[in-house]
């Protein structure tokens, strides 16, 4: 087999995707399709660098690398110069430019962008979880949830679930209605991961009346009557006492404040979530 006209050795202490994309962008500026890219990810030892360069010296090679560990980077450059192999340090120049502007040193930890991507996908997963297990639609999610919220209608269960999902937490919520028995799963899970939500009846009647107006319904509906609200609150209070779960009054609290209280409760209990926090 004949040699390629150009062999680009992509070397990285992470997966090497960044250096490979830069190499592809660079080679696209030339009228040639006779090239090959060889990627060497997770390089963290001098021995590995020597092995790669020993191979590269016999090719029409260029090295493109993203290595943030100073000792390894300097070793690679020294050996490439010694073997007369052209190289391009893809990441150091922009790190140096940013350090001069920010006036703080770069962390120089391999694979940080990958960790950011992982956090993003965990967040997406948590949001999808909150949607799937909202309003008791599927009680199988209660055992998988980091947090389970429960309370009567209009006690901020859904917005709180979504807010906490954006913090990478899997949250399910269960409505409490006097005419409907709570799902058995609610009593089978650890009560320490359940948070009960309650509210002031006067505040709740205002919220429910506004909800009825938005739906084009009359305020006389039982849903917004004080008698019905007292009945629901009393019923929910009984369920929460049976569960033995912490209860938060959300009457005068913004979603962010209620979420902060919930997280503080779990912190005090020393609870660890599925996201490791």
Swiss-Prot record:
Alphabetized GO MF terms: ADP binding; ATP binding; phosphotransferase activity, phosphate group as acceptor; protein serine/threonine kinase activity
Write down the InterPro entries for this protein, in alphabetical order.
Kinase-pyrophosphorylase, PPDK_reg
- Would the keyword Nucleotide-binding be found if you checked this record's keyword annotation? yes
| EC category | transferase
Keyword Transferase found: yes
Coiled-coil annotated residue ranges, if any: none
Keyword annotations: Kinase, Nucleotide-binding, Serine/threonine-protein kinase, Transferase
Q: What is its EC number?
A: 2.7.11.32, 2.7.4.27
Superkingdom of origin organism: Bacteria
Quote the catalytic activity from the record.
N(tele)-phospho-L-histidyl/L-threonyl-[pyruvate, phosphate dikinase] + ADP = N(tele)-phospho-L-histidyl/O-phospho-L-threonyl-[pyruvate, phosphate dikinase] + AMP + H(+); N(tele)-phospho-L-histidyl/O-phospho-L-threonyl-[pyruvate, phosphate dikinase] + phosphate + H(+) = N(tele)-phospho-L-histidyl/L-threonyl-[pyruvate, phosphate dikinase] + diphosphate
A Pfam family cross-referenced in the UniProt record is Kinase-PPPase
Which positions are annotated as binding ADP?
A: 151-158
Q: Which family does it belong to?
A: Belongs to the pyruvate, phosphate/water dikinase regulatory protein family. PDRP subfamily.
Q: Which HAMAP family match?
A: PDRP
Summarizing the function annotation, the protein's role is: Bifunctional serine/threonine kinase and phosphorylase involved in the regulation of the pyruvate, phosphate dikinase (PPDK) by catalyzing its phosphorylation/dephosphorylation.
Name the UniProt record assigns to this protein: Putative pyruvate, phosphate dikinase regulatory protein
């Amino acid at each position: 087999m004949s040699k390629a006209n150009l062999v680009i050795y992509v070397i990285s202490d992470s997966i090497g995707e960044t250096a490979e994309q830069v190499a592809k962008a660079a080679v696209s500026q030339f009228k040639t399709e006779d090239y090959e890219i060889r990627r060497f990810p997770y390089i963290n030892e001098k021995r590995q660098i020597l092995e790669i360069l020993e191979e590269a010296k016999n090719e029409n090679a260029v090295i493109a690398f993203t290595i943030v560990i100073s000792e390894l980077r300097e070793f690679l450059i020294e050996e490439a110069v010694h073997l007369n192999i052209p190289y391009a340090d893809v990441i150091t120049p922009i790190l140096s430019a940013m350090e001069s502007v920010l006036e703080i040193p770069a962390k120089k930890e391999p694979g940080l962008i990958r960790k950011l991507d992982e956090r993003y996908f965990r967040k997406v997963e948590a949001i999808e979880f909150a949607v799937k297990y909202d309003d008791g639609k599927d009680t199988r999610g209660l055992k998988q949830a980091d947090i389970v919220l429960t309370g009567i209608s209009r006690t901020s269960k859904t917005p709180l679930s979504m807010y906490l999902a954006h913090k990478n937490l899997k949250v399910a919520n269960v409505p409490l209605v006097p005419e409907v028995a709570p799902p058995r799963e609610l009593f089978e899970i650890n009560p320490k991961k359940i948070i009960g939500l309650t509210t002031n009846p006067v505040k709740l009647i205002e919220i429910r009346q506004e909800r009825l107006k938005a739906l084009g319904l009359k305020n006389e509906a039982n849903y917004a009557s004080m008698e019905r609200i007292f009945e629901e609150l009393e019923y929910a209070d009984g369920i929460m006492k049976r569960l033995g779960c912490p209860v938060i009054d959300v009457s005068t609290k913004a979603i962010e404040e209620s979420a902060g209280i919930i997280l503080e409760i779990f912190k005090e209990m020393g609870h660890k979530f599925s996201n490791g926090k």
